[in-house]
Every structure is written in structure tokens, then in C-alpha cells.
């Protein structure tokens, strides 16, 4: 067993879908890669989930997720903030843009919709299922919901 000193290393997964035909238009190669994106939820994933205090309040950054997003951007991945807040874009988007800028992230796209170009979603509420089965990929998520 190896002893660890200092902070534990951050695991950053690189999406595996580069070049696959996952776009709405079934594009291949670089054209497909330019459309593909990683979705990152805001509250509870990129920012700490605080009790609702209105659109202007966004929790403190979650350090590990901030690092992941910055690495993905450096590697050339397209990252979007996928948040339910964006259902009211006039109220939601300006404070999110300000929060991103304040915490060193670029002007990312902000949406509340996913499409076939999304290759991954990072969210505190997701349960991944085996396609066409309804069965969870990993262990039963219920213990984590309590």
C-alpha cells in the first residue's frame, strides 16, 4: 500500500466519444467533434447547492468540478452549463455569466435542454441507465439519495 502525501489527485475522465456519429445530423470526424459537448449542471455540481435565494444567488464553486471543467476546456472540449435555472433565461443567464467570470471560467453556453450532441452529463441528480433497459449502470443509487 502506498502512503499519500498532500492532496489526493483529481480524476479527470476524458469523454470517449470524439469522432463518433453522435450528432443530430450524423456527422463524422472533426465536424462531429465540433458539435459534441459535455453538460455540467450548476447547483450541486459546479456550484454548491444552497437553499433557493433567487436567481442572483449561486453557491460557492465546487473545486474538483471547476478543475475538471477547466481541463476539458484546455483540451478543446465544448462545455455547456445545463441547468433548470435557464428555463427563465432573462433572469438566470446574466448572474450565471457573472459567476462563471468571477470564478475564472470563460463565457460558456448556458441551456436547460440536452440534445444528441451531448456526449456526457455531469449532474448531482443523474442515474445512468443501460440503454433500452431502464436498469442502472452501477449499484442501486437509492442509498445516495437519503
Residue ranges and their predicted role:
Residues 2-146:
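Catalytic phosphate/metal-binding cores of nucleic-acid and nucleotide-processing enzymes, i.e., regions
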